[in-house]
Amino acid sequence: MGRFVNSGNSAFQVALNSEIYVDKTGLLAYTNKVMDTTAKFICNSRPRRFGKSITADMLTAYYCKGCSSEEMFSSLEIGQAPGFTKYLNQYDVIHLDIQWCMEPAGGPENVVSYITEKTILELRNYYPEILPDSISSLPEALSCINTATGQKFVVIIDEWDVLIRDASTDLVVQEEYINFLRGMFKGSEPTKYIQLAYLTGILPIKKIKTQSALNNFAEFTMTDARIFSRYIGFTEEEVRMLCEKYHRDFSKTKHWYDGYLLEQYQVYNPKAVVELMIWNKFQSYWSDTGTYEAIVPLINMDFDGLKTAIIEMLSGNSVEIDPTTFQNDMVNFTCRDDILTCLIHLGYLGYDQDTHSAFVPNEEIRQELAKAVKRKKWNEFLTFQQESSELLDATLDMDADTVARSIEKIHNEYASAIQYNNENSPSSILSIGYLSTMRYYFKPIREFPAGRGFADFVYLPKPEYSRDYPALVVELKWNQNAQTAIRQIKNRQYPEAVTNYTDNILLVGISYDKKQKTHNCVIEKYSEK
């Protein structure tokens, strides 16, 4: 076995040996299906700690002819699939970890030459009669082997994008690397010697102008995951099973780590879920993953609407974006949407394909973004926070007149940034108004299923604050009075579902008169009859 060619199954065995392993081998049924077809070129991008390397190790263990993996996979999902052994350990597998190669190569400028030299050296051990010393190109070496023997290769590149991210301003390094990838995978000759190509990293494939640099690859991303959706992170069903096994509070786990919406799946951060199961501590595990420093300069770029969008999402709103203009690198940002799309790929935002909108997915990310914003002391954020604290205090004091005046003030000051021209707009203003709840409350739940309908907003206090802070059930009315909102809360029994969390509940009815441009408020304390 070599380091890059037929490296065996020991790396994947480490994952299987771990206390928690969630079976994602069902993905192999898809890669088996597309083997040696036009769909055999795959790029799957996902955030750090979302299982990129484990997936790459799994593919290597399954396809690599340098080991025997039948026993390893037979009890897993793929072991029950038809044709399980057809492709098992049948191919020469080249597995490259670009991040690892950076250090022995001596820096990003040497990575391509290092990979080429070391991989060809290992290939000569397998095919000494076919590869003369004169061959110094890896694509040419693979082509020569294929021509002489008919042998095709599975090529797996982990952290494919590290040179795009870490050498983002070195255009010479990037051009050399992109040309290397094109030589490996584009054109008629690679079609002959590639059985399967699998690239994985944080960013999708870099665009040259508006086209992917490797436009023969099918891309599965955090904005369009398709068949990969249940193999990126942990699904809700998988997390529920782990919570049952480890006796963890599922609803609290959902508040903290859920929120990535991929197709029909609610997807959780696997790193955080595993840490929670083992240590039973609800906290952010995100800052240890290395991207925190990257987002501070991103969110402070001077693009119209960027800071307002961040504040809106921190307060619980979603923001419509166009993810198609992002060039899939860390340099060529042209607008707010490019920054937000980048944050989606980094895992700091979720994305809803149906509404084309970005949002803060969970409490863990909400805390990290809030820290990043506070670190730069945004004037916009500090102003919002001060006015929001006054609004929250007035709500908790049941001072309805002050609540109405505070919301009206926020409306008047920020209506230019947040359009206040339709029935959904008061919801956005209300969310921003209660921005300061992020310290004491979980992310507000919109359209909370309760009683005989859906409450507009429900704010549930975090467990450590639940003795001092009531849950808030908030109903909005457009061109109706606030008392009507309170009656709806009571008649449709919205508080009953909230009593599963706490009996300390405030009912807040807020109305907006479009003609008069005024707000009214009624607040009552909930009491079971």
Residues covered by each model-derived region:
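Mg2+/Mn2+-dependent nuclease catalytic core
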Residues: Q174-F180, W478-P495
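Structural motif
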Residues: V154, P470-V474, L506
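Catalytic cores of nuclease domains that cleave nucleic-acid phosphodiester backbones
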Residues: A415-G451, A455
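Metal-dependent nuclease catalytic cores in nucleic-acid-processing enzymes
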Residues: G183-T191, T341-L349, S431-S436, Q488-V508
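Active-site metal-binding core of divalent-cation-utilizing nuclease and nuclease-like domains
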Residues: C144-T149, M438-D468
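Conserved catalytic cores of phosphodiester-cleaving nucleases, focusing on short active-site segments
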Residues: L430, A455-P461, Y469-Q480, R492
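Phosphate-binding site recognition
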Residues: M1-N422, Y441, I445
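Domain-level recognition of nuclease-like catalytic cores that cleave nucleotide substrates
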Residues: A497, D503-K529
